[in-house]
C-alpha cells in the first residue's frame, strides 16, 4: 500500500522523521509521496526523498494557499526541481476558495502556470480543490490531453463532482476524512463509484488523523503508519479484500507517478 500524500516537511515531524518512515515501513506501507507546497518546502521534500531512495518520492509546486508567492522565479525553481529523478509530479497545486489565504485570481494564475509546466515537462499533476470545483475544472480541462496523469488528492466533493472528475480521467485520492463519522459519511457513500484503477489512498499526515482509530493515539498527529487502517476501512466499505485493495492502490500509485521510470 502506497501513501500518496505525506507532508513530511511539516514542523510536526521535525524531531522524528526517520522514525516516522520506519514505523510506516514496519506497518506495511510500501512507499510514500512527499508533498511540496511551496518552493522551499518542495526543496525540503526532495532532500527527504533523496534520503530514502526507492521508498520516498516528492512533488514540486505551490499550494493554492501560497499562490500569492507565485513569480517567474518560482516557475523556474519548479522546473529545476522537476529535473531530479525523485520528483515525480508537479504540485500540490489547485484552487481553495474555502479560506482564500491567496486571492482567487492569484490562485488561478499559479494553478494555470503549474498546469502549463506539467504539460510542457510531460509530468503528472498533483492537485487540490476545495469549494472551487467549477472553476477548477474549467482551468484544468484544456490541459488534460497534454498531461500523462492528473490526481485530485483529498477528494471531499459531491457525487456530481466525482462523476465529472472521473469522466475527465482524474484519479482520486481518499484520506482518513472518510473515517470521520461526523464529516465523512457523504464521502464514504461515494467510495463504491470510484473504479479500482482510479483509486489512490493517502494519510495527508500530519493532518486528518482518522477519528475511528482504536486505541486512539495519544497525539493528534497523523502518520503514514496509519495508512493500513484507512485501507482496511475503505476495503470494508467497498466490500473488497483489504490485502488486495492495498496492492491495487500501490500499483495505481506506481503506474500514475511512473515510479522507477525517471532515470532511477
From Swiss-Prot:
Pfam families in the record: TatD_DNase
User: EC number(s) for this protein?
Assistant: 3.1.11.-, 3.1.13.-
Keywords carried by this UniProt record? Cytoplasm, Exonuclease, Hydrolase, Magnesium, Metal-binding, Nuclease
Enzyme category, top tier: hydrolase
Q: List residues binding a divalent metal cation.
A: 92, 128, 153
Check the record and name the Gene3D superfamilies matching this protein.
Metal-dependent hydrolases
Q: List, separated by semicolons, the cofactors it needs.
A: Mg(2+)
Known partners and oligomeric status: Monomer.
* NCBIfam families on file: PRK10425.1
Please state which protein family the record places this protein in. Answer: Belongs to the metallo-dependent hydrolases superfamily. TatD-type hydrolase family. TatD subfamily.
Described function:
3'-5' exonuclease that prefers single-stranded DNA and RNA. May play a role in the H(2)O(2)-induced DNA damage repair.
User: What protein name applies here?
Assistant: 3'-5' ssDNA/RNA exonuclease TatD
> Upper lineage ranks?
Bacteria, Pseudomonadati, Pseudomonadota, Gammaproteobacteria, Enterobacterales
- Which gene underlies this protein? tatD
